[in-house]
């Protein structure tokens, strides 16, 4: 079966030109855990062929309930390596670069899209600020998916106007503290559901996966809008 057949259902909606735009698009994704891993898979399954994934974590047993790279067999392995192997089984012709490192404020190379799915407030803040400095690169970010049950409460909004999300609030507070703000508006995925506190930071796949798939849809819809 030729490779085009695998993406025929995507092309039915996006059209031949839309598929070509998706194949030519370059995306960098920071964080491949409970949100980012599902975003990566959704993009590759839709037809994206140029993806760079960045994460310095290894798979842990506590990841198995929600993270795509996590199985009993992959515990202890770098998440980006496991995910790259999986994505290449979906499309062996895809150019997938795996960077086993945490973001520490470095300058960013230009991509068409940057997706932020990291948890650290400091790293997330620095990434958003630096990413919005890169001309022509669209930036999408994930806010807090943990401590929630309801996938139907997942929505999107602009970072500075999101309410009821502790992570968005913490990011804005750090921006104010360091005196730096995004150079342009940043569209985010978040949940309107009130967080449910628990002793450990609980999270469920049905919510984190919807966050990830929403991020992927933001990329695809942006390409459609730009057409």
Give the positions of each predicted feature:
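Conserved N-terminal Rossmann-fold NAD(P)-binding element of oxidoreductases
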Residues: 29-31, 54
């Amino acid at each position: 079966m030729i490779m085009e057949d695998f993406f025929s259902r995507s092309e039915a909606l996006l059209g031949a030109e839309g598929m070509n735009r998706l194949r030519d698009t370059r995306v960098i994704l920071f964080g491949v855990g409970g949100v980012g891993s599902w975003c990566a898979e959704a993009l590759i399954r839709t037809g994206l062929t140029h993806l760079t994934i960045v994460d310095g974590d290894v798979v842990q047993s506590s990841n198995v309930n929600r993270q795509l790279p996590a199985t009993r067999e992959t515990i202890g392995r770098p998440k980006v390596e496991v995910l790259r192997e999986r994505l290449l089984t979906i499309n062996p012709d895809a150019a997938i670069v795996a960077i086993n490192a945490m973001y520490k404020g470095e300058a960013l190379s230009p991509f068409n899209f940057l997706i932020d799915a990291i948890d650290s407030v400091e790293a997330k803040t620095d990434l958003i600020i630096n990413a919005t400095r890169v001309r022509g690169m669209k930036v999408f970010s994930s806010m807090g998916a943990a401590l929630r049950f309801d996938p139907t409460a997942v929505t999107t909004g602009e970072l500075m106007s999101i309410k009821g999300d502790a992570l968005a609030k913490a990011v804005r507070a750090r921006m104010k503290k360091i005196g730096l703000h995004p150079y342009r508006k940043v569209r985010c995925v978040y949940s309107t559901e009130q967080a449910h506190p628990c002793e450990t930071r609980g999270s469920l796949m049905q919510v984190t996966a919807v966050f990830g798939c929403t991020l992927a849809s933001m990329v695809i819809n942006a390409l459609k809008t730009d057409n």
